[in-house]
């Protein structure tokens, strides 16, 4: 009886695309918090993953979800692009559903109330 094991520990990874120079491959950086046992303080720990992007649909700055491959595609590529969570520059507030830039909502001119024309 053989058990298929993944070659990586992280099955699902959320990270930011930092490079797309390689063909059909995205370079993704994931950040997680690690507790220092002596200081009892959390510090950021970054790890870089290479993910297979078959359609070459992601660009630098996108927030993406990666899925671990059961068998690595190459020495470094062990994940594949599962989903683009947020495209760069197109951030939607999850509570209101409105597009935003930083802490301000982007209002389109069509969504503002218009004044009625008075006919005399």
From Swiss-Prot:
Pfam families: Ribosomal_S17 (PF00366). Belongs to the universal ribosomal protein uS17 family. It comes from Mus musculus (Mouse). Component of the mitochondrial ribosome small subunit (28S) which comprises a 12S rRNA and about 30 distinct proteins. Keywords: Mitochondrion, Ribonucleoprotein, Ribosomal protein, RNA-binding, rRNA-binding, Transit peptide. One of its GO terms (biological process) is mitochondrial translation. It comes from the Eukaryota. The gene is Mrps17. CDD domains: Ribosomal_uS17. This is Small ribosomal subunit protein uS17m. It is found in: Mitochondrion. GO terms for cellular component: mitochondrial inner membrane; mitochondrial small ribosomal subunit; mitochondrion. The keyword Ribonucleoprotein applies. One of its GO terms (molecular function) is rRNA binding. InterPro entries: NA-bd_OB-fold, Ribosomal_uS17, Ribosomal_uS17m_metazoa. Residues 1-20 form a transit peptide. The keyword Mitochondrion applies.
